[in-house]
Amino acid sequence: MDSLAESRWPPGLAVMKTIDDLLRCGICFEYFNIAMIIPQCSHNYCSLCIRKFLSYKTQCPTCCVTVTEPDLKNNRILDELVKSLNFARNHLLQFALESPAKSPASSSSKNLAVKVYTPVASRQSLKQGSRLMDNFLIREMSGSTSELLIKENKSKFSPQKEASPAAKTKETRSVEEIAPDPSEAKRPEPPSTSTLKQVTKVDCPVCGVNIPESHINKHLDSCLSREEKKESLRSSVHKRKPLPKTVYNLLSDRDLKKKLKEHGLSIQGNKQQLIKRHQEFVHMYNAQCDALHPKSAAEIVREIENIEKTRMRLEASKLNESVMVFTKDQTEKEIDEIHSKYRKKHKSEFQLLVDQARKGYKKIAGMSQKTVTITKEDESTEKLSSVCMGQEDNMTSVTNHFSQSKLDSPEELEPDREEDSSSCIDIQEVLSSSESDSCNSSSSDIIRDLLEEEEAWEASHKNDLQDTEISPRQNRRTRAAESAEIEPRNKRNRN
């Protein structure tokens, strides 16, 4: 099959491009190789191309009509046309190169010449015909009219009396020579060559078709040879049957390798490679079954091996282009050169990756900053809540401690109340100051300060507690009296 580059035609043969396009497959865009026609839509494709396509989709690639492989039929005339076009291509190109190029100026001048001269010729013929008719009418006029005309001419041209009678005789002779004979005018004109002759047709004794008598011998020869060709074609078709389709999902590895061995194919590779190899063999084998002279199975196996080798070479070349290969014998300088070449070759790709990484880092940094601020706010709120809870606990413990200490010292209740109130005020001030500074100090520092203040207060009142040793009965009485005094005070405070 010729490539697309060979299908270019020179400007002189631009008309051949349409024929060239019509003789190409619509799938591979090469010349038809074992052309097959789809009877439902009359579209033509290469046998191998359409079989591969139908294994993917059971429809026509052009009009999407449902088609199966048994529906395909041979179209031998297209194969013959492709052969004849390839044979005539060189002759046509040579003829186009040898023939001189016609300039547009020369062609236009010829057209003008035709336009100018054709009306002149027609006018001359019309003038000659009118003159002949005039002369013919003058000859057949009566004698009286001729005499009258002669008299008028004599009267008009009186100065020309000196003209000799010999001139008159010459004029009459010339008129007689120009005028046609009436017998010749009455003769029927011969039929022109442009009129078609009646063609006699004869029935062919072999096929019974009406054939012109002049071509009957040629038709008989072709008709008899056609019968021989039909018999040979029928015999060749029955010799080779196409391979049936196989369901690879139901086949085990062992059965698949057995099928490959039957046709002489290689069994190396994984299951997917083996399936692909067998599919390719089946497509090529069935496509060759449609040919007049099909290839043998061994030839198809060799073609498949060559295709696989070229495919592996291409894959290896692609890998070598993108991968650095080192050997044991290479020196450090050679390795550095390979590295530098690789960097230069893929500099743009590296830069693209760097830019992408930077963009991604910026996005991640922005997201992380947002999350950090949110976490900080959450932590500050948690700390504030914990500090407030700790302060409330400390307040309750301090008040309980104050009440117990006052109950233990009833003699000095009255004078110590003022001190207790002042100390409570101090503690409240400390707590309020600690609340204001809670955002800056941690909860542990605040608790430590409160404990230190409590220890200092206990140390200051330790001596008073040691001096007042009261019996349990007195303690009970003092507690009852204190509770009685404290209740109205609390009520007053509430009111």
UniProtKB/Swiss-Prot annotation:
The modification Phosphothreonine is found at residue 118. Residues 152-197, 400-423, 456-495 are annotated as: Disordered. It is found in: Nucleus; Cytoplasm, Cytoskeleton, Microtubule organizing center, Centrosome. One of its GO terms (biological process) is protein monoubiquitination. Gene3D superfamilies: Classic Zinc Finger, SAP domain, Zinc/RING finger domain, C3HC4 (zinc finger). Zn(2+) binds at residues 204, 207, 219, 223. The modification Phosphoserine is found at residues 99, 103, 122, 125, 142, 158, 164, 322, 471, 483. Its EC number is 2.3.2.27. Keywords: Acetylation, Cytoplasm, Cytoskeleton, DNA damage, DNA repair, DNA-binding, Isopeptide bond, Metal-binding, Nucleus, Phosphoprotein, Transferase, Ubl conjugation, Ubl conjugation pathway, Zinc, Zinc-finger. It catalyses: S-ubiquitinyl-[E2 ubiquitin-conjugating enzyme]-L-cysteine + [acceptor protein]-L-lysine = [E2 ubiquitin-conjugating enzyme]-L-cysteine + N(6)-ubiquitinyl-[acceptor protein]-L-lysine. Residues 479-495 have a biased composition (Basic and acidic residues). A zinc finger (UBZ4-type) spans 201-228. GO terms for molecular function: damaged DNA binding; identical protein binding; polyubiquitin modification-dependent protein binding; protein-containing complex binding; single-stranded DNA binding; ubiquitin protein ligase activity; ubiquitin protein ligase binding; Y-form DNA binding. There is a cross-link at residue 376 (Glycyl lysine isopeptide (Lys-Gly) (interchain with G-Cter in SUMO2)). A motif (LR motif) lies at residues 232-240. A zinc finger (RING-type) spans 25-64. Residues 410-421 have a biased composition (Acidic residues). One of its GO terms (cellular component) is nucleus. The modification N-acetylmethionine is found at residue 1. Pathway: Protein modification; protein ubiquitination. Residues 248-282 form the SAP domain. Its main location: nucleus. Belongs to the RAD18 family. Homodimer. Interacts with UBE2A and UBE2B, one homodimer binding one molecule of UBE2B. Interacts with SHPRH. Interacts with HLTF. Interacts with SPRTN; leading to enhance chromatin association of RAD18 and RAD18-mediated PCNA ubiquitination and translesion DNA synthesis. Interacts (via C-terminus and phosphorylated form) with SLF1 (via BRCT domains); this interaction is required for efficient repair of UV-induced DNA damage. Interacts with SLF2. Interacts with SMC5; this interaction is increased in a SLF1 or SLF2-dependent manner. Interacts with DNA damage up-regulated protein DDUP. E3 ubiquitin-protein ligase involved in postreplication repair of UV-damaged DNA. Postreplication repair functions in gap-filling of a daughter strand on replication of damaged DNA. Associates to the E2 ubiquitin conjugating enzyme UBE2B to form the UBE2B-RAD18 ubiquitin ligase complex involved in mono-ubiquitination of DNA-associated PCNA on 'Lys-164'. Has ssDNA binding activity. This is E3 ubiquitin-protein ligase RAD18.
